[in-house]
Amino acid sequence: RRQRQMCIRDRAFGETVHRLRKLGFAVDGAAVLAAAGGKLPTLELVAEVMLSDAAYDTPLLAPYREGGARGDMPYINFYLDYGAQGRPAFVPVDFMDYRDAVALIRDNGGVPVVAHPGLNFRGRERVAERLLDFGAEGLEVFNNYHDTTQIGYFAPLVQRRGALMTCGSDFHGKTKPLIGIGQFRFDDRFESYLRASAARLLVLP
């Protein structure tokens, strides 16, 4: 299964490079793979490679340089602008079935919780209820992406379902330099339920 997923990702990366080149970026796939060092080559890494070498310079990169409109967090902004779902370099990847992923997490002693569902399913937040139906044990309700409306939807949903409520900053180091560890939007009304969820996690088998 792991080998199959790696092959799928390799093909997707090749198609991503092809699409970026068609858009006008002088992407060198081999250079990105070398920088990845055997790890997954992400769009954030593509941006880092291009922004760190004048050989890749193009006016298309200007917004992501220091002082540019998207230069505050250039790597993740590049991904959001070009690689996110619906963007011009997005390549659909056929990952494992969701229920198989849930089973795999449980089989290895983990607890399946959906991270930042409001970011992944913006405008389709009700998908989160289906994810709980099919095995997720909780939702990340508080983070740096969910607005007050989304929090107002996810928090009561988790409470009604008796699911786990979690929080997270989504800190990614240099990829998201404006996000610090432990910093996230929060609503004090749900503190007691969040603490109860944390206590449950400590005693789960």
Task: Give the label of every model feature segment.
Residues 3-8:
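Short, small-residue-biased leader/transition segments that mark boundaries at the very start
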Residues 9-43:
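Conserved phosphoryl-transfer catalytic core
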Residues 14, 28, 58-59, 91, ...:
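Residue-level signal for secondary-structure boundary elements
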Residues 96-110, 114, 118-205:
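Charged catalytic cores and adjacent phosphate/nucleic-acid-binding surfaces used
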Residues 27-29, 57, 138, 165:
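Residue-level detector of short coil/turn "hinge" positions at structural boundaries
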Residues 40-113:
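Conserved acidic, metal-coordinating active-site core of Asp-based
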